């Protein structure tokens, strides 16, 4: 399940993020990579323990917890503190094909999560850089993702993925992982489809529509059956 989530941040918020990030110090992105990923990773990151990363990361989480599409698709239990990276053409930055670590731990908070879902939140407009596509592989093939600034993509952490070399400009983004209440990706996808259908019925016929009410009951009973909290 690959889901695009528009307007997580407004254009003004993106501009403010970029001002803070441009004024911050950056470090080698391999510092947060696993052993396999570090061999194919070339980019820069904001230090995870730095003031900029912590401030902006909390603002990303706040925005997501107000986003109905994200909450419906992810059904999040824990969100890992967002990280921030930059791929520049001057260094030929890229991130080769890899899969994310199954478990992530944050040494600053002690948080440990199972990585069910990965998210990239784009912070540079696509016409300001060439290359830098996020390529995600699944059973249906490869999917290239390059979204407007402020938009995000959510995808299974079990997916092989890569970032193609940046050949002009700079690709700037936030990336992070989350543990869902619903461990099984197939079940999570079906529940998301059900929730989307309920929302559509409610918009068309109102919250008191008998079919919408019945399906809402089914939705909550499925969550009750499958949720790990």
From Swiss-Prot:
<dbReference type="Pfam" id="PF13640">
    <property type="entry name" value="2OG-FeII_Oxy_3"/>
</dbReference>
<dbReference type="InterPro" id="IPR006620">
    <property type="entry name" value="Pro_4_hyd_alph"/>
</dbReference>
<keyword id="KW-0847">Vitamin C</keyword>
<dbReference type="GO" id="GO:0006879">
    <property type="term" value="P:intracellular iron ion homeostasis"/>
</dbReference>
<feature type="binding site">
    <location>
        <position position="98"/>
    </location>
    <ligand>
        <name>Fe cation</name>
    </ligand>
</feature>
<feature type="binding site">
    <location>
        <position position="100"/>
    </location>
    <ligand>
        <name>Fe cation</name>
    </ligand>
</feature>
<dbReference type="InterPro" id="IPR005123">
    <property type="entry name" value="Oxoglu/Fe-dep_dioxygenase_dom"/>
</dbReference>
<feature type="domain" description="Fe2OG dioxygenase">
    <location>
        <begin position="78"/>
        <end position="180"/>
    </location>
</feature>
<dbReference type="InterPro" id="IPR044862">
    <property type="entry name" value="Pro_4_hyd_alph_FE2OG_OXY"/>
</dbReference>
<dbReference type="Pfam" id="PF18331">
    <property type="entry name" value="PKHD_C"/>
</dbReference>
<dbReference type="GO" id="GO:0031418">
    <property type="term" value="F:L-ascorbic acid binding"/>
</dbReference>
<keyword id="KW-0223">Dioxygenase</keyword>
<dbReference type="GO" id="GO:0005506">
    <property type="term" value="F:iron ion binding"/>
</dbReference>
<dbReference type="InterPro" id="IPR023550">
    <property type="entry name" value="PKHD_hydroxylase"/>
</dbReference>
<keyword id="KW-0408">Iron</keyword>
<keyword id="KW-0479">Metal-binding</keyword>
<feature type="binding site">
    <location>
        <position position="171"/>
    </location>
    <ligand>
        <name>2-oxoglutarate</name>
    </ligand>
</feature>
<dbReference type="GO" id="GO:0006974">
    <property type="term" value="P:DNA damage response"/>
</dbReference>
<dbReference type="InterPro" id="IPR041097">
    <property type="entry name" value="PKHD_C"/>
</dbReference>
<feature type="binding site">
    <location>
        <position position="161"/>
    </location>
    <ligand>
        <name>Fe cation</name>
    </ligand>
</feature>
<protein>
    <recommendedName>
        <fullName>PKHD-type hydroxylase BRADO4652</fullName>
        <ecNumber>1.14.11.-</ecNumber>
    </recommendedName>
</protein>
<keyword id="KW-0560">Oxidoreductase</keyword>
<dbReference type="GO" id="GO:0016706">
    <property type="term" value="F:2-oxoglutarate-dependent dioxygenase activity"/>
</dbReference>
């Amino acid at each position: 399940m690959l889901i695009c989530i528009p307007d997580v941040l407004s254009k003004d918020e993106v501009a403010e993020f970029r001002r803070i990030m441009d004024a911050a110090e950056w470090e080698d992105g391999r510092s947060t990579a696993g052993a396999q990923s570090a061999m194919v990773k070339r980019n820069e990151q904001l230090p995870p323990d730095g003031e900029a990363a912590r401030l902006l990361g909390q603002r990303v989480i706040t925005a997501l917890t107000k986003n109905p599409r994200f909450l419906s698709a992810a059904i999040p239990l824990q969100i890992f503190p967002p990280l921030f990276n930059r791929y520049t053409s001057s260094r030929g930055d890229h991130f080769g094909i890899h899969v994310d670590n199954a478990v992530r731990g944050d040494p600053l908070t002690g948080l440990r999560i199972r990585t069910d879902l990965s998210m990239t939140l784009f912070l540079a407009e696509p016409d300001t850089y060439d290359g830098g596509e996020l390529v995600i592989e699944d059973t249906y093939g490869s999917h290239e993702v390059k979204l407007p600034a402020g938009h995000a993509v959510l995808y299974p952490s079990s997916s092989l993925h890569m970032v193609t070399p940046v050949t002009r400009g700079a690709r700037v983004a936030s990336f992070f992982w989350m543990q869902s209440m619903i461990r099984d990706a197939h079940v999570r996808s079906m529940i998301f489809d059900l929730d989307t259908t309920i929302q559509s019925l409610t918009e068309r016929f109102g919250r008191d529509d008998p079919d919408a009410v019945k399906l809402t009951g089914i939705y909550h009973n499925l969550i009750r059956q499958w949720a790990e909290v």
